């Protein structure tokens, strides 16, 4: 029957009409939105259009692309130029805790919550924030941040990493107050810090995002024309790349060069290595354009001051397009050392690196010579052991380092080397690695600029606590490592320049001393422990001494552990004897108790037997009396029967006599 509607059809029609009425009511009375001082607060209200989106809101997106699409979909009133930088899971404290996500862009701080179709949307312009503080939930748990504007206070809690979230918001807030905008490099670095290297964007989307950032961002008043020209030149020279950013390069917290097995290299060997190196270096067919050197530490969001000597020598410096890593810039300094000499110091088996490795407790170094690859790059592999003596990481760890000299390098003018190191024995070593990039740029005949940038990369994403532990230990180790490397290079610079000075020219000597006032001021206190005479010493004796110290340490440790084990054995023997005594006493007590129970049972048995005998005797006596009485009664019965018989006989005789007579 096609014309008659079924019961299910009627119910569906009723439900759809009810839903239509509710939807029309919500559309006629939408959730009110109030805007005060660029603080947009969308009042709470049900959202019937986004019922399917409730579950997608709670399921965390895994890539930056998904998060950015959520951000654009949830905050449509924001300018199109705003790009998501970070987002954090948190809760807004109102009458109840509204669990949601906090989205951070360059100029806005937004919050979105969707709990069972009940939406809350808040947008705060960073320039309108008067102050922000770290707070504690219930005055006990340090996981909250309070944002205060001129008109309202917002208390966000339940942060997984409160300090890191606070620092990111605070830095962007300060940039807005100082009227500074993020550069493309800073923007990409912040994305990789928050979302990792896997952003979910293809090459076209990444290029469009970069171009939109460069085109839209206004020039900050505080930025110099040199920075602007540098950015323009960087745009023009972006087609010249030294390496693909998609290739992960392994490195570690401490990277060095040196071969302990060749500790006693002489000048002839170093010259041979120099000739080999020169023969392998390719030359560029195209001259690279000049780009001003920038010293921005992207991770710390502050500008590193350049030396005065670098400014004065910038005319003679052959600058190349710089491509620092997205981590931290640890060294950016001009040294009074030629570019080729700097390369020899850092990337050959030089006495400098052997001495530096010894000071860093690096032993058992084995390295391969530079070999040319098919693509034109050159490769060098090293293995060594790092003595740590840390309770968290152990006594030592093996490491493998791969150094890549790119084909864009020019002999005695420009060197670009990536150092890839992998540690094998530290905790969570399969989760992370670091990449160190060395850029040596010729400034003049006897000067060069050394730039060292480092990035911490992950093979697989660890959970929050492990990641913070890895980053804390890795960055502190890297900072300590490169501080000492810079200090030792300054000492080597001073020694090399003193060696080439003419002692007969006093004025020249004085002028040279005035030139090196910069070095004397910037060398850390650690350099005072070194002397120029130490440079000529080989590192083999130091390494042997380290080995002996480790052997002595191992012997002492074995003795201590043996004593400890012996004490444990004695303690176990004592406990065993005491336990045996306790067991023997328990068994004796058990036997005594058993004997007592047996004796009690025997006495009770004797008493019961006597009573039984007495009872039997009484019963026998009573039975005898009964039998005696029975016999007497039987005898009486017998006598009675005899008398009766006699009576019957007498009667019979009388009857017989009477019959005869009759």
UniProtKB/Swiss-Prot annotation:
Residues 69-136 form the GRAM domain. It is found in: Endoplasmic reticulum membrane; Cell membrane. The keyword Transmembrane applies. InterPro entries: Cholesterol_transport, GRAM, PH-like_dom_sf, VASt. Residues 265-276 have a biased composition (Basic and acidic residues). GO terms for biological process: cellular response to cholesterol; intracellular sterol transport. The chain crosses the membrane at residues 557-577. Its main location: endoplasmic reticulum. SMART domains: GRAM (SM00568). It is a single-pass membrane protein. The keyword Ubl conjugation does not apply. Keywords: Cell membrane, Endoplasmic reticulum, Lipid transport, Lipid-binding, Membrane, Transmembrane, Transmembrane helix, Transport. GO terms for cellular component: endoplasmic reticulum membrane; endoplasmic reticulum-plasma membrane contact site; plasma membrane. Residues 326-497 form the VASt domain. Residues 1-34, 212-237, 249-284 are annotated as: Disordered. It comes from the Eukaryota. GO terms for molecular function: cholesterol binding; cholesterol transfer activity. It holds the Pfam family GRAM. PROSITE patterns: VAST (PS51778). GRAM domain binds phosphatidylserine in the PM and mediates protein recruitment to endoplasmic reticulum-plasma membrane contact sites (EPCS) in response to excess cholesterol in the PM. VASt (VAD1 Analog of StAR-related lipid transfer) domain, also known as ASTER (Greek for star) domain is a sterol-binding domain. Cholesterol transporter that mediates non-vesicular transport of cholesterol from the plasma membrane (PM) to the endoplasmic reticulum (ER). Contains unique domains for binding cholesterol and the PM, thereby serving as a molecular bridge for the transfer of cholesterol from the PM to the ER. Plays a crucial role in cholesterol homeostasis and has the unique ability to localize to the PM based on the level of membrane cholesterol. This is Protein Aster-C.
